């Protein structure tokens, strides 16, 4: 049975743009994929999303329960769907903490300093979808493209199938619309991504 992991980094418990995008994605995806096991990782609740790498925990940060467990799950999963709203010009800190736990040399990528030549990603099995939102129009802060950053990270780890849906400009263009109305404007794009997954 295919396993799809939902990585929830939204700081809003429910009803956010990214949660509503996920609802639409799953509605479409499940129509053609009835025998899929969905695994929910809410990074707001799991230690892997709460614990940041620092001098106090450097010696045990990459423990089995907070690192290898998740790496092993990613290596056997069909794909992951990441909820990534922009927070302070980047994805949420919980997602950064998760990335720090799972992007580990010789586990999710071969480090160029260990293997002669370029680094080699080890998550080649994985398909990735990012469902994202941001208040500013895309491009207002060229240095703050959190979706592009995630694409680069997962590409480095060997992922070749990466798709995203970004609702940008939520604080200006869509400020007078309710969230579901806005998500409905992106329904066609979400359906395309779900059908390609």
UniProtKB/Swiss-Prot annotation:
<dbReference type="InterPro" id="IPR023048">
    <property type="entry name" value="NADH:quinone_OxRdtase_FMN_depd"/>
</dbReference>
<comment type="similarity">
    <text>Belongs to the azoreductase type 1 family.</text>
</comment>
<protein>
    <recommendedName>
        <fullName>FMN-dependent NADH:quinone oxidoreductase</fullName>
        <ecNumber>1.6.5.-</ecNumber>
        <ecNumber>1.7.1.17</ecNumber>
    </recommendedName>
</protein>
<comment type="function">
    <text>Quinone reductase that provides resistance to thiol-specific stress caused by electrophilic quinones.</text>
</comment>
<dbReference type="Pfam" id="PF02525">
    <property type="entry name" value="Flavodoxin_2"/>
</dbReference>
<comment type="function">
    <text>Also exhibits azoreductase activity. Catalyzes the reductive cleavage of the azo bond in aromatic azo compounds to the corresponding amines.</text>
</comment>
<dbReference type="InterPro" id="IPR050104">
    <property type="entry name" value="FMN-dep_NADH:Q_OxRdtase_AzoR1"/>
</dbReference>
<keyword id="KW-0285">Flavoprotein</keyword>
<keyword id="KW-0288">FMN</keyword>
<feature type="binding site">
    <location>
        <position position="10"/>
    </location>
    <ligand>
        <name>FMN</name>
    </ligand>
</feature>
<dbReference type="GO" id="GO:0016655">
    <property type="term" value="F:oxidoreductase activity, acting on NAD(P)H, quinone or similar compound as acceptor"/>
</dbReference>
<dbReference type="InterPro" id="IPR029039">
    <property type="entry name" value="Flavoprotein-like_sf"/>
</dbReference>
<comment type="subunit">
    <text>Homodimer.</text>
</comment>
<keyword id="KW-0560">Oxidoreductase</keyword>
<dbReference type="InterPro" id="IPR003680">
    <property type="entry name" value="Flavodoxin_fold"/>
</dbReference>
<keyword id="KW-0520">NAD</keyword>
<dbReference type="GO" id="GO:0009055">
    <property type="term" value="F:electron transfer activity"/>
</dbReference>
<dbReference type="GO" id="GO:0010181">
    <property type="term" value="F:FMN binding"/>
</dbReference>
<dbReference type="GO" id="GO:0016652">
    <property type="term" value="F:oxidoreductase activity, acting on NAD(P)H as acceptor"/>
</dbReference>
